[in-house]
C-alpha cells in the first residue's frame, strides 16, 4: 500500500486534515500524519463570513499524529501533503521539517500543498520559479521567494500541486489523484 506523508500541527485546519486522511484511505493509500511530535493534535475550523476581511476560527477536532518530523524517512513515502490553517505559521520554523521538504524535492517526489501550507514550501526554498496558488493572504510569502501566484482552483507545476482553501478540495484532489495515477 503506497504511503503519503500529511503535514500539520496544532492550529491546523480540521476539515483539510480529516478530508485528506479519509480521501487517501478511500483510494487505498496509507496516510501518515506528521507533526513536531507524535501525539493528539488540536485542530481548528476556519470559515468565511460576509463582512469579514479574513477568515474566522473555531475550535475543531483532534487528530493523532503518527510520526514526528525528525523521524520521517523520505524514501518511505510516494508524496507529501502540506495542510493549511495556522499550523504553518510556526511549522515553517521547524528545521527538521524544512529539510524533509527539501529532501522530497531532491528525490523528485510529489509535493501537494493547500492554503497556508505554501508557507512551508516558501520557507523550505523549493518553489522559486514555480507557478502556485494559495490562500490569498499567503500570496506575498510565495512571491517573495520567487514563485508566481495565480488565482485558480488547483495548479500543477511539475511535481507541485497547490490549491487556495478547502473550498477547492474537488479540483485539488482530482489533480492529486491524476498525478498519482500517472495520468
Q: Language-model features: where?
A:
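Catalytic nucleophile serine of serine hydrolases
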Residues: 115
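Extended, subdomain-level signal for the structured scaffold at the beginning of enzyme domains
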Residues: 1-107, 111, 120-131, 139-183
